[in-house]
């Protein structure tokens, strides 16, 4: 069953807010901007993560220098799952942030 438009937007909004909170509470030197539903996280080394919503597909997209990743929400687990690799969003972010910033953050709740 596909997510309703309202549920999809609520989930993406909550996910982006949780990401902002987590990054704000970290010791990382970064800048964030959330504009028109797109969350951009810029690290001090120039790399960035871009989170955007793809409403027609009901997906959360992540752009990183290593590529683009499309996540579907799994109602059973309550997690975003990459359609290509089946990796959880939180697991992928832990790896990417470690590679980009050298800090381990806990994205288990994402």
Curated annotation (Swiss-Prot):
Cellular component annotations (GO), alphabetically ordered: cytosol
Entries under InterPro entries matching the protein: CyaY, Frataxin/CyaY, Frataxin/CyaY_sf, Frataxin_CS
A Pfam family reported for this protein in Swiss-Prot or TrEMBL: Frataxin_Cyay
UniProt entry keywords in alphabetical sequence: Iron, Metal-binding
One Gene Ontology term of the molecular function aspect: ferrous iron binding
Gene3D superfamilies found in the cross-reference section: Frataxin/CyaY
Coiled coil stretches, renumbered: none
Entry superkingdom: Bacteria
Annotated GO biological process: iron-sulfur cluster assembly
Protein's job: Involved in iron-sulfur (Fe-S) cluster assembly. May act as a regulator of Fe-S biogenesis.
Membership in a protein family: Belongs to the frataxin family.
Name assigned to this protein: Iron-sulfur cluster assembly protein CyaY
């Amino acid at each position: 069953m596909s997510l309703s438009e309202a549920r999809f937007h609520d989930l993406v909004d909550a996910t982006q807010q949780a990401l902002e909170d987590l990054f704000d509470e970290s010791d990382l030197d970064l800048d964030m901007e959330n504009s028109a539903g797109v969350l951009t996280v810029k690290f001090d080394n120039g790399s960035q993560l871009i989170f955007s919503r793809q409403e027609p597909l009901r997906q959360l997209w992540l752009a990183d220098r290593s590529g683009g990743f499309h996540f579907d929400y799994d109602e059973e687990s309550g997690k975003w799952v990459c359609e290509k690799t089946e990796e959880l969003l939180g697991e992928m972010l832990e790896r990417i942030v470690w590679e980009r910033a050298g800090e381990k953050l806990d994205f288990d709740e994402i």
